[in-house]
């Protein structure tokens, strides 16, 4: 590295460590904790006793000024802890990212203060994509930013739904923000970068790899106050996101699916284990993730049944009245467990309401 002998500041040291290491690297994390970012970088760059040989090739190739210049040319900015736009939720992670690479002009800290992560299976069903899109759209209308991972399936539906609701959506990448992945979502991710943000802890040029996806999932969980899993099989990576959210004491929700669908086994299990609250729409998500008492979902109630508003005696007489045949007053006293006077009074009230009718053989329900 051409700048190995310089004395970098915290920001430069974080960028350098990010370039030579991997997300959640335990060696770098320990060094930063013990020596600070500048001391950690100095130890790795000098490699005095050969303890950090595994970083040597990347250290040798690193030209920090060139990295930062290339990022600036591509419209990529670097956020570090303490910056005004730094997502404060990331500080809750045991292995927090050294820095965040961002394409997009939104103030991340501001939009993430009222946000929801919407995640789920890549191989989603039509049901899952429809529900994810509708939830994300309606959350955006309610001024929630929607965070997801940019993948096919539920992630795509969530991003598109938020955009359709004229909202802000943020895509967290498992590779560099200059290598938008998957390729089939390139145009969508470009639109997200223009209107919201595409973010990653991996530096520009980094390719998406499996371990980076797992590391990325913890960012999705940490950045927002809550995560909703729309559809997930039993081995879906979105379950990893949900469990990260639970460990971080974030609110977790899941949309139930058909018990016959393998695509919903994971979400149903999250609900069964008590990890996730059951939600069915954006209103219920907003109630969970929004300000206490400010985003209440309407109660779901069925249509009132005939006679629900009646006093007790007429209601008991109505319940005792047959539908297809008539009944005498004596029979009604036995069926309803009431006196003759109560039955006659109840029948009179029901007749006035059009709920009971006289017949040659006694009384029956009207209609």
Language model regions located:
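Glycine-biased, small-residue-rich flexible motifs in mid-sequence functional cores and linkers
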Residues: 1-9, 74, 78-367
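Short, small/acidic-rich helices and loops at N termini and domain boundaries
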Residues: 1-87, 353-362, 366-367
